[in-house]
Amino acid sequence: MSEYKETLNLLQTPFPMKGDLPRREPALVERWAAQRVYARMRAAAAGRPPFVLHDGPPYANGDIHIGHAVNKVLKDIVLKSRFAAGYDAQWIPGWDCHGMPIEHRIEQLHGRGLPPAAVQRLCREYAFEQTERQRRDFLRLGLLGDWPHAFRTMDFRTEANELRFLERIRARGLLYRGQKPVNWCVDCQSALAEAELEYARKTSVAIHAGLRVRDPVDFASRFRRRPVLDKPAMLVVWTTTPWTIPGNAAAGVRADAPYGLYDTPGALIVVAQPLADALFASLGVDHALCALARGRELVGLALGQPFFAGRDVPVVEAEFVTLDAGTGIVHLAPAHGAEDAELCRRLGIAGENVVDGAGRFAADLPEIGGLPLADGIARIVAKLRADGTLVREAAFEHAYPHCWRHKTPILFRSTPQWFIGMDIECEQGEADPGRAAVTEEAGATGEARKVGKAEEAEEAGPAKTLRASARDAIADVPFYPPSARQRMEAMIDGRPDWCVSRQRTWGVPLPYFVRRDDRSLHPRSARLVEAVAARVERDGIAAWSRLRPAELGVDENAYEKLSDTLDVWFDSGSIHATVYRDAARADTGGYPADLYLEGADQHRGWFGASLMTGCAADGRAPFRAILTHGFVVDGAGRKMSKSLGNTVSPQRIADTRGADILRLWIASTDYAAEMSISDEILERVVETYRRMRNTLRFLLQNVADFDPRDDAVPAGQLLDVDRYALARCREFVDACRSAYARYDFVAVTRLAHGYCAEELGGFYLDALKDRLYASVADGVERRAAQTALHSVLANLLISIAPILSFTAEEAWTVFAGDERDSVFLHTWDEHAPPPDDAALARWAHVRALRPHVTKALEEARGAALIGRSSEAELVVRAPRDVLDALAPLHGELAAVFIVAGVTLETADQIAVAVARTPLARCERCWRHEPSVAAHASGDALCARCRHALSRRARAERSEPRAAVGSR
């Protein structure tokens, strides 16, 4: 064949076998930006059904990490696949910019004590720098989106709209001021939301402490026995927060639980009977049960406060007492526990903070005032021991909430804060803050009271609590994976009132004026908030910092403005009010968003915050579906940690292997679970990528001289195997569309790899090679094959483009011959071939027969009967119904099986016999053909090759032509 090689249709392509992705990809990033590809996608999609993907904004601080990459690439895959499916797919990226981490960073760089205006200016500058830095990293991953209009929560308009949105919630009666225990970080010097907590192992000092009985006679009567005066009697509590002992205000018991009175060497001790054996075993003391009483019989008993000798505390019924650990008697400190506070509020029992905002004991506490927590705990324990009320002290390891930023344990302490109430009933329907003027304010005990009156919202539904509204709002929302629904429901059911106020400088202010005497809101709050919002929209949050109440007609002697800022989760959780509903961006269309997509930790984070703000303002969720992805772990299943040295940089992967390798790993990994990554795993991804790239290269080579406008063959002139290939292409497209639509990207990668390796590489392309290489270059047989390949290639590229974005675009540029064109401007509906069930049915018999043929050929090679399959003639024996199906395809079977000939015979079962062909071999195409005869050159050529050479010679004589393969 060597002397005929130049006469074959062996075409070239500028699409190389080696991807060299780290070098090629950055140029495509620049091209997409310069050519405004996303904007052109939106323009091309005008009038199509909208699909809105709302971005949960990452925090604008530091380099992006592998979790960011997973999140953003998944969103990009969704966006591009929805466009390919015929939607006007929209994604506006953004950043979360306010909050403690940035303010803390500015304090590190510039020191504390700066005036608020300076802090806000420096924070804004720093946040902007961080967003630009992260933007570059995100773009490097191939993300398309509305980057020119990316949002930042610190944008003036966004800040202003957040104020307006908060006022809508207040107008529905859900915002109130209360004195409640909140999560408090001594380093942040601020309250924290549940979503700002991380749970880590902590070893605490746990104590069993006795609360002495004040009246032995009353005590004895409750156990129906005579008083015992020779020993002190104590109810024993167990706590892992001994620092709260000075704040003890009551002891809680379970009403129906049995409590035993036990005689021990040093005292009479009362604990829940089911827990007594374990307790006394840990103490190692002898004990004897003297009497029993139900918890309800102990209610009202007076006990001595364990820290303050002259103070009494009562025994109360507490429904949250359990009998699975401890003593069955709970130490209640209403200033330092949510359940304690609520119970004591109902009972009229006041509580006092024993720790200040810096984590030191209150200055007025005897013996421990002003001490750091650890020192004070030691003195409390020593005092209890000296008083004879310390029953046991031990180290206790448990999961404890820590500040997500400082990694330090938080405190629970009562502070005046602003809350969105989860269980306050309000009318359903969108509130009109211009007509309504209602709020809630809570007194020192946390009880909410009305301070205004709400006018009914138009078309208001029945009153519901925010908790109930949130539950109803997600009832019909699909979750991916479905198990994520339970997490969201658990978040709703267990969520306390949302503390939305913070004591920081860099944040959106609570835009209210309160009376100096009773802290009630100004009666004109609705109009005042709009006036403040107008100023913030012009000048940012600095406008509030420098605003004097008198400028808005507020009596400064009677009112003062709040100094609190809003929780950053309220910032990001309310961003839907600006990004997709703001009149300035009315072109986005579609609210609620079609999809929210974030990590598994966002059920109590952004998912939860968005759900609560949407329901609080409008009574509905701001999303139609939720997709949750898992965290990234290393190859051994360990979480990423700098201390373990197992972190993986997405930038490094992009710079060494290519962003498409990272994208393919993300798509081929089940996001519903933890996502493992390592060099070994990435190497396997590279192998998958190479297979698909080689398939693309083969396809591009073999359509290099094909122009569908001039060369396409009508469907009626296609060979049946080409029609079958197009039918299988349509099945592949439909399967990909379905998998993308249900966000099953693992299925897409399997489909694409299987299509390249098995359907194309393992069947159709093998069957085509002879026709492509040896047939007349512009003959119908070859053009028919190219017609099918052109469609296959277009649909394959559109199908893999959401995942292998760089590679698909590189290939499309070669395929289209136009750098201005982009694969992302095309849809399946434009290119997918029509379904052809008849072709699929015909060729199902061929595909079923193929394994029998392959096995027979392998056995013939093993017996040295043949070398190449082209030297074989087959006798296919099969039942009549199979032969009837194969008969119309008989003329194509030899090419499909790559043999010299096929004979069909009837038999009861399928069997394939192989014989060596006696036919001569063509020296050009290497087929064994009856038409092989001597050529003028002296070589033996088949009739097809003689015709091809003759056509080629005439063409060369008639006019000079470019080398075969040029466009």
From Swiss-Prot:
SUPFAM superfamilies for this protein: Anticodon-binding domain of a subclass of class I aminoacyl-tRNA synthetases, Nucleotidylyl transferase, ValRS/IleRS/LeuRS editing domain
Name of the protein: Isoleucine--tRNA ligase 2
Residues that bind Zn(2+): 922, 925, 942, 945
Positions contributing to L-isoleucyl-5'-AMP binding: 598
Catalysed transformations (reactions): tRNA(Ile) + L-isoleucine + ATP = L-isoleucyl-tRNA(Ile) + AMP + diphosphate
GO BP terms, alphabetized: isoleucyl-tRNA aminoacylation
Organism: Burkholderia mallei (strain ATCC 23344)
Cofactor(s) required for function per UniProt: Zn(2+)
Keywords: Aminoacyl-tRNA synthetase, ATP-binding, Cytoplasm, Ligase, Metal-binding, Nucleotide-binding, Protein biosynthesis, Zinc
Motif 'KMSKS' region, residue numbers: 639-643
Pfam families documented for this protein: Anticodon_1, tRNA-synt_1, zf-FPG_IleRS
Protein's gene: ileS2
Stored InterPro entries: aa-tRNA-synth_I_CS, aa-tRNA-synth_Ia, Anticodon_Ile_BEm, Ile-tRNA-ligase, Ile-tRNA-ligase_type1, Ile-tRNA_ligase, M/V/L/I-tRNA-synth_anticd-bd, Rossmann-like_a/b/a_fold
